C-alpha cells in the first residue's frame, strides 16, 4: 500500500509544478488540442445543424435493438430485477420442477449459476457500472440540458434512456459471451474482445483487431476526460463554491485528494472496486433520491406545473433558442447519451467479470442501468431544478430558459485616447444569437466587430476592436453615427448553458447545487 501511494505522488508531482507555472488545465489543452480537434471533427461531424453523427448513431442503434429484440426494456424488466435479487443464482442445483426458478421462454439462457467462472456477482457488476454513469451527467448534465433547451429536454432524455436500455442489454451480453478467463481466474472482457472475436467469426478478422485496438485507446482517453476529469472538475467547482475556497491551489488539492482515494480503490482490481461500489452506490443513490423527494414533496403544489412544462416544452415548435422541437430533442439526446453511456461499450468491461455461465443474464442486469441513471435520477434532478426555478410562491423565475445574463467589464476608448470607464454592465445573450455568431462575441447591442482595417472579425483574439455598429453600454452611447470607438474586453467566451442566479453566473453542477441549497 505504501508503494502505491509513492507511485501516485511521484506521478502527480510533475503536474503540480506545471500547474504553478502556467496552469495544468491550460498545458493539457495546448498539448491535446490539435488531436482533440481532429477527432472531434470526425466523431462530432454534424449531419445537420446541431445533430452530431455520433448521437444519431447511438440513438438509431438503440431504436434498432429495441425493435429487433421486441422491446426487451419492457418485456424483461421484471426478470432483470429478479436476476439482480439472486432468484436464479443456483438454479442448476435446484429441482427442475420448481416453478419459481423456471424460465418462462422469453430468453432461453437468462438463468445464472453463481458458482461458475467469474469474479463478481450480478449486483456488484451493476453497482460498478452504475458508479461510472451516475454522477456528472445526472447532476451537471441535466442542468445543462435545461439551461440550453428548457424543461422539454427532460422528456427527450427519458426517451433516450428507455431506448438506451436495449443498447446496454446487447453490449453487456456480448461482453460476457466473448470474454477470456485466465488460469488464475481473472476475467478479461469488453468491446476489445467482442469486436475482435465477433468480427473474426463473421470473416472480418483484420477489421475486428483494428476496431478493438481503437476502442481500447479511445476508452483510456475517455476515462481521463469525460470519465474522470469532467467529474472531478464539477465536484471541485461545487466544493469551492460551497466552502468559499478562493485559493488558486484549492482545485489542485481537491483533485489530488480525489486521485488518492480512487487510487487506493482501483489498485485492488475489479474485486475491490466491486466490493466498494456495492456498498457506496446504493447509499449514494438512495441519499440523493431522498434529498430530491424531500424538495419535491415540500413544494408539492408545483409538481403538476413542472410535469406540464416538461411535456409541453418537449413539443413546443417555438422552443427558445435551440431550434424548436428538433432542437430540444437533440439537447435531451446529447445529455442522456453522456449520462447513461448506452452504446459506449464501457459498461461491458465491468459486466464481463460477473459470475455466470449465461451471457444474456448479465445483459438483463445491464438494461437496468439507463433506467436507474436517466429515467429515475435524471428526472428527479430535472424536477428539483424546474421547481426551484418557479421561485417559490412569488412565481418569479430564478433564471431564463435558453438565455443567460452575463456581466462583464468593458472599456470604450475614443481614438483621441480619451478614456471612458464602463462599470459592470448587464447584457442579455440569447442562445440563438450565440449559434448564429459562431465564434463571435454574442452581444445583442453590437451587430458586428471590425478590425482597424475595416475587416469583419469573427473571433476576438486580440485586445481591442472597433465597434462598427451602434453600441449603448450602461446607458451611454459609445458609438454614434460617423464616430469610431475602440471597445475592449475579455476574449470570446462560450456562455451557452450558463444562467445568472442572484447576480452570479452558474453552469452545470452549480445550477443543481443552487436548486438544492
Predicted regions and their residues:
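Membrane-interface loop-to-helix entry segments
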Residues: 3, 65, 69-82, 211, ...
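Helix-loop-helix module between adjacent transmembrane segments
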Residues: 65-66, 130-131, 160-185, 196-233, ...
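Membrane-embedded translocation segments of transport machinery
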Residues: 267-278, 283-357, 369-370, 384-390
Amino acid at each position: 500500500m505504501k508503494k502505491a501511494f509513492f507511485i501516485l505522488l511521484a506521478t502527480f508531482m510533475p503536474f503540480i509544478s506545471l500547474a504553478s507555472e502556467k496552469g495544468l488545465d491550460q498545458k493539457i489543452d495546448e498539448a491535446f488540442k490539435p488531436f482533440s480537434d481532429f477527432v472531434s471533427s470526425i466523431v462530432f461531424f454534424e449531419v445537420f445543424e446541431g445533430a452530431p453523427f455520433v448521437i444519431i448513431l447511438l440513438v438509431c442503434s438503440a431504436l434498432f435493438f429495441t425493435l429487433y429484440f421486441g422491446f426487451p426494456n419492457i418485456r424483461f424488466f421484471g426478470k432483470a430485477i429478479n436476476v439482480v435479487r439472486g432468484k436464479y443464482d443456483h438454479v442448476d442445483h435446484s429441482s427442475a420442477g420448481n416453478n419459481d426458478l423456471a424460465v418462462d421462454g422469453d430468453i432461453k439462457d437468462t438463468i445464472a449459476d453463481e458458482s461458475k467462472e467469474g469474479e463478481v456477482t450480478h449486483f456488484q457488476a451493476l453497482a460498478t457500472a452504475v458508479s461510472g454513469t451516475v454522477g456528472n451527467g445526472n447532476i451537471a448534465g441535466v442542468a445543462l440540458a435545461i439551461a440550453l433547451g428548457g424543461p422539454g429536454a427532460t422528456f427527450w432524455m427519458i426517451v433516450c434512456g428507455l431506448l438506451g436500455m436495449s443498447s446496454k442489454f446487447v453490449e453487456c451480453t456480448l461482453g460476457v459471451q466473448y470474454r477470456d478467463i485466465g488460469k488464475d481466474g481473472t476475467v478479461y472482457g469488453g468491446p476489445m474482445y467482442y469486436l475482435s472475436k465477433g468480427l473474426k467469426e463473421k470473416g472480418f478478422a483484420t477489421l475486428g483487431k483494428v476496431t478493438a485496438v481503437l476502442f481500447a485507446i479511445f476508452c483510456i482517453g475517455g476515462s481521463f476526460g469525460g470519465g474522470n476529469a469532467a467529474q472531478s472538475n464539477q465536484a471541485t467547482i461545487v466544493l469551492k463554491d460551497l466552502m468559499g475556497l478562493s485559493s488558486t491551489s484549492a482545485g489542485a488539492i481537491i483533485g489530488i485528494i480525489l486521485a488518492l482515494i480512487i487510487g487506493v480503490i482501483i489498485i485492488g482490481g475489479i474485486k475491490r472496486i466491486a466490493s466498494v461500489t456495492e456498498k457506496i452506490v446504493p447509499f449514494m443513490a438512495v441519499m440523493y433520491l431522498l434529498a430530491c423527494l424531500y424538495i419535491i414533496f415540500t413544494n408539492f403544489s408545483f409538481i403538476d406545473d413542472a410535469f406540464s412544462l416538461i411535456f409541453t416544452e418537449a413539443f413546443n415548435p417555438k422552443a427558445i433558442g435551440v431550434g424548436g422541437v428538433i432542437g430540444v430533442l437533440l439537447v435531451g439526446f446529447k445529455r442522456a447519451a453522456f449520462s447513461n453511456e448506452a452504446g459506449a461499450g464501457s459498461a461491458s468491461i465491468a459486466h464481463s467479470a460477473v459470475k455466470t455461465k449465461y451471457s444474456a443474464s448479465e445483459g438483463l442486469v445491464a438494461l437496468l442501468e439507463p433506467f436507474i441513471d436517466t429515467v429515475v435520477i435524471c428526472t428527479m434532478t430535472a424536477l428539483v431544478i424546474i421547481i426551484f426555478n418557479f421561485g417559490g410562491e412569488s412565481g418569479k423565475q430564478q433564471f431564463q430558459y435558453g438565455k443567460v445574463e452575463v456581466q462583464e467589464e468593458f472599456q470604450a476608448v475614443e481614438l483621441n485616447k480619451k478614456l471612458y470607464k464602463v462599470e459592470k454592465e448587464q447584457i442579455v445573450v440569447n442562445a440563438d444569437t450565440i449559434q448564429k455568431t459562431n465564434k463571435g462575441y454574442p452581444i445583442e447591442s453590437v451587430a458586428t466587430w471590425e478590425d482597424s482595417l475595416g475587416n469583419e472579425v469573427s473571433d476576438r483574439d486580440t485586445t481591442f476592436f472597433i465597434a462598427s455598429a451602434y453600441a449603448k453600454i450602461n446607458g451611454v452611447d459609445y458609438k454614434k453615427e460617423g464616430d469610431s470607438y475602440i471597445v475592449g474586453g475579455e476574449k470570446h467566451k462560450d456562455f451557452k448553458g450558463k444562467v445568472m442566479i442572484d447576480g452570479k453566473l452558474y453552469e452545470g453542477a452549480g445550477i443543481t447545487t443552487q436548486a438544492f441549497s
